[in-house]
């Protein structure tokens, strides 16, 4: 078929490459540090996460906790975010456990390293810092996801007045490189950063309706 235009990898060839880790944020983002109610990973890394014993709970002065704030540094979001990964033949899901490690809840045999997943400072405007998640597959290959902002997808919040402000949060870590077991052979991926051209602003409009009686 001489009239058919070939793809970038050749005629009748398809290149299936890439992959990503995507996140469904539950409550506050796990990796965002806030003055109150940091995410789970941020609280663990900052040493604010404490597992109380039964004796601790019995001694907790609830009536003073709000007024005098005896325990201000123990506030954090307990609900872990849900991470889904999909690359090549591999797919699965994991969360961050109470020790700050990744725990697979679907898809077995994967080792997930969060040591280079950065804790982000709270911001509603600034791009996130470098953040990397590493996954070792059952066949021994090491996959790197994320890196600088070109390998990250993140959302800038639209914070209308009178609502609780949301921070900038990473939504996806894109596959950035692959290494074999020997780490002598590998491949790297590069991405071009771009910002969304169209921006939509959320606003609130309140109307009060009723009847008025005149006597």
Residue ranges: model-predicted function:
Residues 138-140, 180-186, 192-194:
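Acidic, low-complexity segments
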Residues 174-184, 214-215:
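A short, hydrophobic secondary-structure junction motif
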């Amino acid at each position: 078929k001489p009239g058919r235009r070939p793809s970038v990898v050749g005629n009748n060839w398809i290149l299936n490459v890439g992959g990503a880790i995507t996140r469904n944020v539950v409550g506050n983002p796990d990796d965002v540090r806030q003055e109150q109610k940091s995410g789970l990973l941020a609280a663990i890394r900052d040493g604010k996460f404490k597992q109380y014993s039964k004796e601790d709970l019995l001694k907790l002065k609830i009536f003073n906790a709000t007024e005098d704030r005896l325990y201000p540094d123990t506030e954090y979001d307990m609900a872990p975010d849900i991470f889904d990964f999909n690359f090549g033949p591999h797919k699965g899901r994991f969360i961050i456990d109470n020790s700050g490690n990744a725990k697979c809840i679907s898809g077995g045999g994967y080792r997930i390293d969060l040591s280079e997943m950065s804790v982000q400072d709270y911001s509603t405007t600034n791009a996130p810092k470098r953040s990397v998640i590493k996954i070792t597959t059952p066949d021994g290959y090491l996959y790197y996801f994320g890196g600088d902002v070109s390998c990250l997808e993140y959302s800038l919040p639209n914070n209308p007045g009178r609502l609780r402000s949301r921070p900038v949060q990473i939504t996806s870590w894109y596959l950035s490189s692959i290494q074999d077991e020997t780490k002598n052979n590998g491949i790297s991926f590069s991405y071009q950063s771009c910002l969304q051209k169209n921006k939509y602003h959320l606003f609130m409009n309140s109307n009060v309706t009723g009847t008025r009686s005149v006597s």
